[in-house]
Amino acid sequence: MCIRDSYKWVPIGYHGRASSIGVSGQVFKRPQGQTKAPDAAEPSFGPSKRLDYELELGFLIGRGNALGEPIAIGEAEEHLFGVTLLNDWSARDLQAWEYQPLGPFLSKNFASTLSPWIVTMEALAPFRAKFERPEGDPQPLPYLDAPSNRAAGALDITLEVLLQTAKMREAGEAPARLTLGNTTEAAYWTAAQLVTHHTVNGCNLQPGDMLGSGTLSGPKPDQAGSLIELTLGGKQAVTCLLYTSDAADDTPC
């Protein structure tokens, strides 16, 4: 395996953790870490300048499985308690430097926030949809496929990201919408498939464990689930409605 330049500067690691998961609305400090400018010879340490959100769903486990006992896809939803909104905050500049070859570490471990509400799978029964792959894409392998998953494995949930700047709060104005999409277009895998794949090699899940959906971005530009996608990596400004006086102006946020 080729060792990246960052290996000599930062202790590379990859992890999952529960210690820095909090409830939506919590205040946390801006993350710090190593970054390396394209024209710099060495990395530097400091606060992130590219803090980003990731629009996700969190799937909460209600009933676990024994070590060494995979959960079949036809039984996977019996192990799910419910669904919550998840914001998997990311420091993109830290991530760009540290993520090779294992993945993000300090760029994600500083905070993840959850909605204070969990919607049970039973309550979501009216909001189920067919699981269908886009034309031309491969069908799942047999262990990730079942009639029940094809018939109603997907969720039909509206996804929305709103931004409210300090100026907007001071003016008492409502947040501006950045993203409006739906899980039927944004989610490539179902919750049952995530549970089954996670346990297929015998990994045991426990009550209260959470599986993140990954960033939920639809095919249209205004369905992007993160700023890095919405701005095309910082190349395109995000415009929202800022109120600076009696008039409203479209101003880059």
Cite the ranges covered by each PLM segment:
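Conserved small/polar residues in nucleotide/adenosyl-binding loops
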Residues: 1-5, 243-250
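Active-site microenvironments in enzyme catalytic cores
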Residues: 4-181, 188-192
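Acidic active-site catalytic centers that drive phospho-/nucleotidyl reactions
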Residues: 56, 88, 209, 246-250
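Active-site pocket scaffolds in enzymes
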Residues: 188-200, 206-207, 211-245
